[in-house]
Amino acid sequence: MSARICITGASGYLGRALCRKLDRSRVLALVRAGSAARVEPGVASLELDVFDAGQLTRALAPGDTVVHLIGTPHPNPSKAAEFRRVDLASLQACASAAGRARVAHFVYVSVAQPAPVMQAYVEARQAGEAAIAEAGLAATILRPWYVLGPGHRWPYLLLPLYAIAELWPGTRDTARRLGMVTLEQMSRALARAIGDPPPAGTRRVLDVPGIRAA
């Protein structure tokens, strides 16, 4: 039997998009109480406290792939406290559990960095990456800046500005690092990362150009 793919945040818009690209018979959605009904059809779910490392450890098994997608919806600078209370705390619990369970691969959606804005968000995601490293996990870290999708379309208006910025040597690297990706690109990159894990004990990072090329 193929190893499981255990996904936190599977009921969110990115989690659902990812599940549609996977063999659903292999997926276990780890969701908060009351969220199982929002998981994609055909995906098994387990309701638990996603902030409780003990519960998460008992849900995982050696050889599993864990994909951590929990995050504050529509992040903005006013949500700094939520970034630590939700994004970081859930990641720390999940990484700790994954280490104890000896999972094979940990996949985390971080954020493009460095960045001139959203410092609290970037710091929370950097701390999440550090927790993964501390747990000694083989990991794939994806670093998008903004994912265009349902309810997240207004930044399409900025695409012409990004195109201009990528033409100039002085702004090219920043524009590419902080470029936007589509929901299709993001879910495809996640699915490919799951299917092609890095060697044991190593960490692989996909920035925006890498996500687009996946």
Task: List each language-model region with its residue ranges.
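Conserved Rossmann-like nucleotide-binding pocket used by diverse enzymes
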Residues: C6, L46, V107
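Oxidoreductase cofactor-interface core, primarily capturing Rossmann-like NAD(P)-dependent enzymes
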Residues: A10-Y13, A101, P116-A214
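Short, glycine/charged-enriched secondary-structure capping and boundary segments
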Residues: R20-L22, P41-A44, L60-A61, A81-R84, ...
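Conserved Rossmann-fold NAD(P)-dependent oxidoreductase catalytic core, especially the SDR/UDP-sugar
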Residues: Y13, L28, A33, P77-A81, ...
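Active-site beta-alpha turn of Rossmann-fold NAD(P)-dependent dehydrogenases/reductases
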Residues: I70, V107-S110, W145
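NAD(P)H-binding glycine-rich loop region in Rossmannoid oxidoreductase-like domains
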Residues: S35-A93, A97-R100
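N-terminal Rossmann NAD(P)H-binding glycine-rich loop of SDR-like oxidoreductase domains
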Residues: A3-R24
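Structural motif
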Residues: R4, D64-T65, H105
